[in-house]
C-alpha cells in the first residue's frame, strides 16, 4: 500500500514518486480533494474507488476506509490511497497506517505538497518572510467532533506565532476569529481566505480577522479554503502572480483527439485556463488498410 499525497489541487503538483505509484497501482482509493485528472497516470484497467468526505456528506466512514485499504492489499493488489495535500497533515494518514500495521500489511508514505503552504503561495502570500514573519503554524479548523473539548491552546496560539494557517476552517470561522481576538490578536490583523488554491478556479478574499466572517458571507465564499492570518497577507499586493495570468478564470473546451490534446491543454493551463478535454474525434487506422485513401489520392488530379 502506498499512502500518497496528491498535492494541494493542481494535478501537476503531485510528486514524481506519487506519479510512479499511480502508474503501477491495481486499485486507487481516492479522496474528494484529489484531482481526478491524476487518474490519467494510472493503468486503463485500474480499480477506482471514491471515498471522499465533504462537510456533512461522507461517502464512507473513516474506519471502513482504513479496513478497505487493508482488505484490497490482502487480495494481493498494489493499492494507492490517494489523499489531498499530504497524508500526515490533517489527512488521517496516520490512522490508516496504524490499521495497516495491525493487519500486517506493508506500506509506504509518499509525502505531498500541503495546501497550507501552496495555497497561500499561489495567492502571492508567503507563510514566512524575514521582515514580518519568522514563524508559522498550521492548525485544523475542524477538530474531532467526538472530543469533549478543544485541544487548541488559543491563549498561546493567538499571539505567539506570526503566521497562522487554518485548514478546513470556513465552517468554524466565527469561532476561530472570536478566539483569536479574545486572546490578543488584533481585529485589524490582515487575513485572507484562499479557495481551491493552486487550481484555475482559485478565489482569494483579502480581509482582516475582525471582518472575515462578514466578508465571507458577503462574497458567499464556500469550502474548501485555507484561512491565513498575519502581516504576510499584505505581501500579496506586491507578489500576486497566479491570478494575473492572461487566461486565469477562463474555462476552455479542448475537442482535439485524446492523444493530441495534452500539449495544447498544458499550454493553456500554463496561461491560467481551466481546460476540459472532450475529444470530438478519434484518430485510428482505417479498416481497409488505407485502400480508400490511396484511391482518393490517385484521383487527386481530377479535383479543382
Regions found by a protein language model. Give the residues of each.
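A contiguous loop/helix-start segment that scaffolds small-molecule binding in enzyme catalytic cores
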Residues: 1-3, 74-79, 140-258, 263-265
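A polyampholytic, Gly/Pro-enriched intrinsically disordered region
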Residues: 71-73, 126-138, 209-221, 295-303
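Class I SAM-dependent methyltransferase SAM-binding "motif I" and its flanking Rossmann-like core
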Residues: 10, 86-160, 205, 290
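Class I S-adenosyl-L-methionine
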Residues: 1-11, 16-113, 118, 218, ...
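Short hydrophobic/aromatic-enriched beta-strand-loop microsegments
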Residues: 46-53, 104-108, 127-137, 184-193, ...
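Short gly/pro/ser/thr-enriched loop/turn and capping motifs at secondary-structure boundaries
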Residues: 36-37, 55-57, 114-118, 135-138, ...
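Surface-exposed, charge/polar-rich loops and edge strands
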Residues: 187, 245-304
